[in-house]
Amino acid sequence: MYGKSSTRAVLLLGIQLTAIWPIAAVEIYTSRVLEAVNGTDARLKCTFSSFAPVGDALTVTWNFRPLDGGPEQFVFYYHIDPFQPMSGRFKDRVSWDGNPERYDASIFLWKLQFDDNGTYTCQVKNPPDVDGVIGEIRLSVVHTVRFSEIHFLALAIGSACALMIIIVIVVVLFQHYRKKRWAERAHKVVEIKSKEEERLNQEKKVSVYLEDTD
């Protein structure tokens, strides 16, 4: 009887640990795809979430897989302090731009070259959270950045706003011009009436004078 109870307790504990363990995995978030111009700098953004509080045990590892194949290359390592590569293509070309307290493990890559094309991996371990999917960013170094759908949308919105502003300005100017024309016409009408009244008065005076002389 005691043996069966112990077995059930162990099984129950195993089920509970299995249910808890996936929650404890570190989750990585990246832009997945990044396009940058040759010779410029790029921020490789990598953020994460962890079940455990961030502490001094946290480590961040960045590696690189070339587009044309070949062995994986070391890019950057962080553990309390940043550690830059002492040799290789990324020497003096990479810097830490993250903040573990804000769950940010990003880096900056300087002076991009065409042979930097490839996949950059971001791995974060925050014991006891050491499992999880490694984040990836596929970097494409190009001569010029192509317009994306967001750029076209921003351009369309900007053009529409500019058109609306122009229409409003035209309407305001037209209304102002129209009021000015009406004011000028009203002034001319008043002036004509005034002259006509003055002429009639003069004629009346002449008529009265002639009658008196007769």
Swiss-Prot record:
Task: Spell out where the chain is glycosylated.
Answer: N38, N117
Which regions span the lipid bilayer? 152-172
Where does it reside?
A: Membrane
Pfam families found in the cross-reference section = V-set
**Signal peptide coordinates:** 1-25
Q: Which GO terms describe its biological process?
A: cell-cell adhesion
Q: Tell me, in one coarse class, where this protein mainly resides.
A: membrane
Q: Which GO cellular component term is one of those annotated? A: plasma membrane
Protein keywords: Cell adhesion, Disulfide bond, Glycoprotein, Immunoglobulin domain, Membrane, Signal, Transmembrane, Transmembrane helix
Those parts of the protein on the Cytoplasmic side are: 173-214
Topology versus the membrane: Single-pass type I membrane protein
Q: Which residues form the Ig-like V-type domain?
A: 26-140
Detail the disulphide connectivity of this chain as listed in its UniProt entry: C46-C122
Annotated InterPro entries: Ig-like_dom (IPR007110), Ig-like_dom_sf (IPR036179), Ig-like_fold (IPR013783), Ig_sub (IPR003599), Ig_V-set (IPR013106), MPZL2_Ig-like_dom (IPR029863), Myelin_P0-rel (IPR000920)
Side Extracellular, residues: 26-151
Q: Which family does it belong to?
A: Belongs to the myelin P0 protein family.
Q: What does this protein do?
A: Mediates homophilic cell-cell adhesion.
Q: What is the protein's name according to its record?
A: Myelin protein zero-like protein 2
Could you tell me which species this protein originates from?
Pongo abelii (Sumatran orangutan)
Q: What is the lineage of its organism?
A: Eukaryota, Metazoa, Chordata, Craniata, Vertebrata
